[in-house]
Amino acid sequence: MDIIFYHPTFDTQWWIEALRKAIPQARVRAWKSGDNDPADYALVWHPPVEMLAGRDLKAVFALGAGVDSILSKLKAHPEMLKPSVPLFRLEDTGMGEQMQEYAVSQVLHWFRRFDDYRIQQNSSHWQPLPEYHREDFTIGILGAGVLGSKVAQSLQTWRFPLRCWSRTRKSWSGVQSFAGREELSAFLSQCRVLINLLPNTPETVGIINQQLIEKLPDGAYLLNLARGVHVVEDDLLAALDSGKVKGAMLDVFNREPLPPESPLWLHPRVAITPHVAAITRPAEAVEYISRTIAQLEKGERVCGQVDRARGY
């Protein structure tokens, strides 16, 4: 069994050694331009077209939760990957736990009005504020996949009203489910906090725009943990300036790194992190990949395969 590996920023040597230890029967090598030797599996992130084109691969593993970069390249270069080759993504590998930490900490930050107290502190103003009530602090999760379910589970502990929206209806205990475009308005109407965990597909690009924001309650909050292209930043800024949206916590942006001239940096109602909400944990990723390859070799059904038509 031959495995090729490519990631522009990861510690390649660590990954090669870890994979060799986890899959001792495999010959693992770092792919370099000009390497056309046979391979059974490819582990990649933002791979060059030539790495995958023309290969008879058993599977490709994207080294992250998103596969939009690979799918966008496939549209421009359909010869890059044969339709018969299954594409897998890292569904969790520690990312679910990180998303839980991020979402819970930020929801509690808003619920306890720490954002308001920070603004008061900036002007040396001492003023206790009325508390929010849980029953009026409904949290809506856009995107009900593996990470969305993890976030919902963690927020249930805090007894907030929860709802989710996705392409198909879910049956999560304690979570009100909405499905399809025809139910999006009803879903949004009660969301005091909107958490975005949608996949990046042509249908979801720009989905958080003026029209969507207008359907939220006045003074809602936005937490974007998915992709920057989901948000029309000018529409969000206008909503923040008007008070329609009271606050936004943004981990992802249309352009990354976020340009220094972006007005998001200095907006008093915006908090920013540099795309760190959930990062790939190498040891857990290697364990998942080695387990999945073993299942594929045995002809077993496995989780995490991407539906190329849907984009996730």
From Swiss-Prot:
GO terms for cellular component: cytosol. SUPFAM superfamilies: NAD(P)-binding Rossmann-fold domains. Gene3D superfamilies: NAD(P)-binding Rossmann-like Domain. One of its GO terms (molecular function) is NAD binding. Belongs to the D-isomer specific 2-hydroxyacid dehydrogenase family. GhrA subfamily. Catalyzes the NADPH-dependent reduction of glyoxylate and hydroxypyruvate into glycolate and glycerate, respectively. This is Glyoxylate/hydroxypyruvate reductase A.
